[in-house]
């Protein structure tokens, strides 16, 4: 049976220990009191059944307060809430998303965040699968060009650093999302 809430923990050190033991990336939700975006994220996005299942199955979820956990949060240079971060098992931040995210887009953010962590651990096939999930879920979605960009990079590294690999994948961005920042970032 799937829990009906995300199994948040509130201790950063515990999250890192569990991440190493369970070999899962850490999803960090940084919030503050009287933050309307934080409230919407908790009440709308993090109560969505599919988001709950994906977070509980794939991540160590930690919930940190912008000011009560100031020593931790300050090291990350955060200035806005809500901020959703993705860290590897050493605690190094690998991806961030700022402000409120609706549930359907959060699924894409989860995939891109996990992919970015996987890429840093040289798990390129896992990263590619996560990024393809974004493309399949929302072929013309707001996160799709970014997913294609990172997939090009993951395929480049998987294939031993062949520029033709990345260029082939990135050609998709030029064709489908020519006005995106992800098209402009290509060398």
Model-derived regions: residue spans:
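N-terminal leader/targeting and pre-domain segments
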Residues: 1-22
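Thiol-based oxidoreductase modules, predominantly thioredoxin-like and allied folds used
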Residues: 4-10, 30-33, 37, 44-70
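Loop/turn elements at helix/coil->beta-strand transitions in domains of secreted/extracellular proteins
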Residues: 22-26, 57-62, 81, 89-92
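Non-catalytic, surface beta->alpha helical segment in thiol-disulfide oxidoreductase systems
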Residues: 44-47, 78-114, 118
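Short solvent-exposed coil/turn linkers within tandem alpha-helical repeat scaffolds
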Residues: 49, 96-100, 134-145, 160, ...
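"A position-specific structural signal for the A-helix of alpha-solenoid helical repeats
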Residues: 113, 150-152
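Residue-level signature for tetratricopeptide repeat
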Residues: 117-120, 137, 154-156
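Helix-turn-helix repeat elements of alpha-solenoid scaffolds
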Residues: 119-132, 159-169
